Amino acid sequence: MIQVLIDADNLSAPQLRALVAALPAGGMRIVVAGSPRALASVAWPPRATVIAVGGWQQADLRLAAAYRLTDEPLVLGSGDGDFSLLAVNHPGPVLVISDRPASRLRGAGTVTDPVTDGTAVLRRWLDEVAG
């Protein structure tokens, strides 16, 4: 099962919408955290766990707590360097969704911005890891 962690405060509304639109209907565990305003900008799939938070770093803390260490693929919807160690040490393939990822995230796996790059890279990566 592909693990998807999304920091709604770290991506723009168009990036969030493009990411959600590209995700397949099944085989995913989706957890999204962010401010109520950021969360309201997207129609989240019913299968997503949506966590509204307030305050600095609260979305990061909730997503870190939701992370599961498995060798299954990880999609990280954030360019925040706070997730660098998580992504670098993840034993499975990692896809980072961001237009300006922290330098350590760039070395963790594939990086794409579905707005600038289109969704082809994202969809191809998902197809490859799904086998």
Describe the residue ranges of each PLM region:
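N-terminal extension/subdomain marker
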Residues: M1-R29
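Nuclease catalytic cores that cleave nucleic-acid phosphodiester bonds
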Residues: R29-G131
